[in-house]
Amino acid sequence: MNIKRKPEWLRIKLGEGRNLNYVKGLLKKFSLNTVCEEANCPNQIECFSKKTATFMILGSDCSRSCGFCNVSHGALQPIDPNEPENVANAVAELGLKHVVITSVTRDDLADGGAQHFADVVNQIKSKNKETMIEVLIPDFQGNKEALQKVVQSKPDIINHNMETIPRLYPEIRPKAEYVQSLELLKNVKEMDPEILTKSGVMVGLGEGEEELIEVFKDLRGSGCDFLTVGQYLPPSTKHYPLKAYISPEVFERYKEEALKIGFSFVASSPLVRSSYNAAEALEKHEEMKS
């Protein structure tokens, strides 16, 4: 397959965009960032049109520069003390039933921004009693005390993405550690078994199928409940190069394998991103329990 030419299954239908400007205006009003825009997510038009967004806290610049990521890594900004309340107000104004909170990585902060995550969760809960809260967190450099702050705020889901297979970490996530990320997910379950955990991987980076299945097994071994698998799309020619477009049939096979391994929900298709249709995983989990 010619990897320079995007296959048909990755061509996005723009759909209805009547709420796009409304959501963007709301974000500007509350001085908020979304990972949808910062990471140039292929689903942002659809999600904005449904009046949903994944809020990105702790500024718009990251302390790391992972090879796959489009988030900028310039001068790090002071934490905005009004951000927790602003996020909570935006959630209320949008009427969200499920909100995802993520962040840039802030290795410059003593707790990696963990207390700020907790403050955001608590503010959302105070103003939006029925909203389900998912946090997509960095690794906090393995700091268990920092992780405990997030866990104690009791979000419904804690997500931490593995991103790729361990062999590719030196190129894709040079400042992260594969085992440390697995330990984070395991530690969440040890700290609070009621919190659901989630992780995501990208494909098309040069991974082998057997290597990917081993990551699935490692994640389940760490107690991970939900899994997302999506196609890597390089943001620019300066980012890590695309090695392959993965067909929808292979994504379906990955989903079947992951479900056999024991995940309670798997989203696996070319345009899946870790926050895309995030509420669906929780709905499926509740159905399985009932």
Swiss-Prot record:
An annotated GO cellular component: cytoplasm
Protein name: Lipoyl synthase
Organism: Alkaliphilus metalliredigens (strain QYMF)
Protein family (similarity comment): Belongs to the radical SAM superfamily. Lipoyl synthase family.
Keywords, comma-separated and alphabetical: 4Fe-4S, Cytoplasm, Iron, Iron-sulfur, Metal-binding, S-adenosyl-L-methionine, Transferase
Enzyme class: transferase
Alphabetical list of HAMAP family matching this protein: Lipoyl_synth
GO MF annotation terms: 4 iron, 4 sulfur cluster binding; lipoate synthase activity; metal ion binding
Catalysed transformations (reactions): [[Fe-S] cluster scaffold protein carrying a second [4Fe-4S](2+) cluster] + N(6)-octanoyl-L-lysyl-[protein] + 2 oxidized [2Fe-2S]-[ferredoxin] + 2 S-adenosyl-L-methionine + 4 H(+) = [[Fe-S] cluster scaffold protein] + N(6)-[(R)-dihydrolipoyl]-L-lysyl-[protein] + 4 Fe(3+) + 2 hydrogen sulfide + 2 5'-deoxyadenosine + 2 L-methionine + 2 reduced [2Fe-2S]-[ferredoxin]
Pathway per the UniProt entry: Protein modification; protein lipoylation via endogenous pathway; protein N(6)-(lipoyl)lysine from octanoyl-[acyl-carrier-protein]: step 2/2
Enzyme Commission number(s): 2.8.1.8
InterPro entries referenced in this protein's UniProt entry, alphabetically: Aldolase_TIM, Elp3/MiaA/NifB-like_rSAM, LIAS_N, Lipoyl_synth, rSAM
Cofactor(s) demanded: [4Fe-4S] cluster
Binding-site list for [4Fe-4S] cluster 1: C36, C41, C47, S275
Cofactor binding comment, as recorded: Binds 2 [4Fe-4S] clusters per subunit. One cluster is coordinated with 3 cysteines and an exchangeable S-adenosyl-L-methionine.
Pfam families tied to this protein: LIAS_N (PF16881), Radical_SAM (PF04055)
Radical SAM core domain boundaries: 48-264
Binding positions ([4Fe-4S] cluster 2): C62, C66, C69
Keyword 4Fe-4S recorded: yes
Keyword Transferase carried by entry: yes
